[in-house]
């Protein structure tokens, strides 16, 4: 695998992935992000076995397709430390990811891709495209009412409902309730699901 990208194309996405990958993991591979270069894009994947986040970096140059996994925290801290507008070069050489620019070179240890545990989505075939701005506003106006450690686990999250051309979100901690809704451009399948609190908080960052 060999590719290049500027700091700005990677830093924000790695920050989001790191927030999932580095939660005091006891399984080493879960502290890593998967980097996959193919079809002219770089895909960054992080999981904690409950959540999986996949982000695509299109503003990059792929020389050789491939994939590897590397420490999310170390990679993010390294990229964050370089000056803005720095062009970074990445190449997997044996068991290391070599990262270089005009002024430095660093090597990070990698772990086998086959050990990376993808969340099985085959049984979850509900897909929806959301308007990030509208979704974010309703999420912000409702998520504050979620419970944080209630024994009634369903309160530690947010109800997400699709019905016809409406998207509704409801949160409550048993004492207060917040509801929000916005119109969707297409007719939607009627669905109800609970978004866990941790996922809702991550989504509040990603929608921006």
What would you call each of these model-derived segments?
Residues 1-206:
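Structural preference for solvent-exposed beta-strand-turn elements
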């Amino acid at each position: 695998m060999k590719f290049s990208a500027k700091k700005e194309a990677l830093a924000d996405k790695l920050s989001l992935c790191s927030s999932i990958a580095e939660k005091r993991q006891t399984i080493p591979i879960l502290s890593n992000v998967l980097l996959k270069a193919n079809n002219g894009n770089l895909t960054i994947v992080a999981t904690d076995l409950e959540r999986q986040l996949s982000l695509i970096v299109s503003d990059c140059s792929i020389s050789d397709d491939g994939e590897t996994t590397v420490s999310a925290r170390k990679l993010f801290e390294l990229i964050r430390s370089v000056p803005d507008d720095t062009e970074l070069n990445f190449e997997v050489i044996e068991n290391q990811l070599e990262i270089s620019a005009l002024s430095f070179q660093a090597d990070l240890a990698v772990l086998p891709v086959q050990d990376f545990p993808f969340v099985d989505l085959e049984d979850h075939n509900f897909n929806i495209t959301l308007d990030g701005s509208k979704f974010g506003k309703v999420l912000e106006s409702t998520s504050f009412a979620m419970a944080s450690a209630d024994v009634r686990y369903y309160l530690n999250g947010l109800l997400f409902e699709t019905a016809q051309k409406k998207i509704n979100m409801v949160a409550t901690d048993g004492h207060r309730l917040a509801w929000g809704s916005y119109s969707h451009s297409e007719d939607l399948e009627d669905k109800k699901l609970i978004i866990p609190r941790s996922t809702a908080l991550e989504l509040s960052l990603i929608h921006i």
